[in-house]
């Protein structure tokens, strides 16, 4: 049953710069989870450090504001403890592609049922506009004293190589389309990435709204491109075209669902195979004490090594 988006709005004051793409992303999240009818008690938003991390304060749920780059491992623990929760990671390109890059890759390899929303503005907005991992080489934004000399990371291509089974790209100012992408990502069974391009009006004076609008287009309007993998055999056939589309970034930037593998089993399904009953009785629902005493008492582990006076 659909809910009102107001059911997910907290009383916290939203602290972002005027015109920030984060507003569009937040509104898209509100509407996506409300149209999916997700109870706030069954929603967990995990964020890292950066402007994007504040999302955890603005959406009602069992949320967690993690350390820099550590949103994905925290979300992994949340999801494994209670696989019935809808877990969303909200992180910036610096947080998830920089210090958190290793965790980003690990999530794809596991294919755990978590949705990653990558707030991608190519700068570190919270710390005065340094170059983030997604800023192309030789671009000089107004906060930089000289052009960026690092090559940029391509988040969607990295996700494809790591094993994510749903990869999409949206634009923060196109809230209707972004809402639909988030809904599909949350419904997907497995690791999902939505790379959300957004202007940073305060620090990125190059990749502005005008810059993006001149380049972005939606792949579903392009005849002949089918990103959906329905059988294992289809992957071998479609992988080259999908990889080429994921590499496309410059004069033309594709938006929409770029890759969707519906054949690979999720990490939870694999756990169920080696731990029968995991899904029906996950760790979060199991008793941790009996008659006031814990099931596992640490003294029992070390009783043969205890030194008594």
Curated annotation (Swiss-Prot):
Binding note for cofactor: Binds 1 [4Fe-4S] cluster per subunit.
pH dependence remark: Optimum pH is 8.5.
Binding site for [4Fe-4S] cluster: 17, 20, 51, 200
EC number(s) from the headed UniProt entry: 1.2.7.11
Residues that bind thiamine diphosphate: 49-52, 68, 94-95, 125-126
Temperature-activity note from the record: Optimum temperature is over 110 degrees Celsius.
Substrates-to-products reaction catalysed: a 2-oxocarboxylate + 2 oxidized [2Fe-2S]-[ferredoxin] + CoA = an acyl-CoA + 2 reduced [2Fe-2S]-[ferredoxin] + CO2 + H(+)
UniProt site (Plays an important role in the binding of CoA): 128
GO molecular function annotations of the record: 2-oxobutyrate synthase activity; 2-oxoglutarate synthase activity; 4 iron, 4 sulfur cluster binding; magnesium ion binding; pyruvate synthase activity; thiamine pyrophosphate binding
Domain of life, per lineage: Archaea
Keywords, sorted A to Z: Iron, Iron-sulfur, Magnesium, Metal-binding, Oxidoreductase, Thiamine pyrophosphate
CDD domains assigned: TPP_OGFOR
Assembly notes: Heterodimer composed of an alpha and a beta subunit.
Function: Catalyzes the coenzyme A-dependent oxidative decarboxylation of different 2-oxoacids such as pyruvate, 2-oxobutyrate, glyoxylate and 2-oxoglutarate to form their CoA derivatives.
UniProt name for this protein: 2-oxoacid:ferredoxin oxidoreductase 2, subunit beta
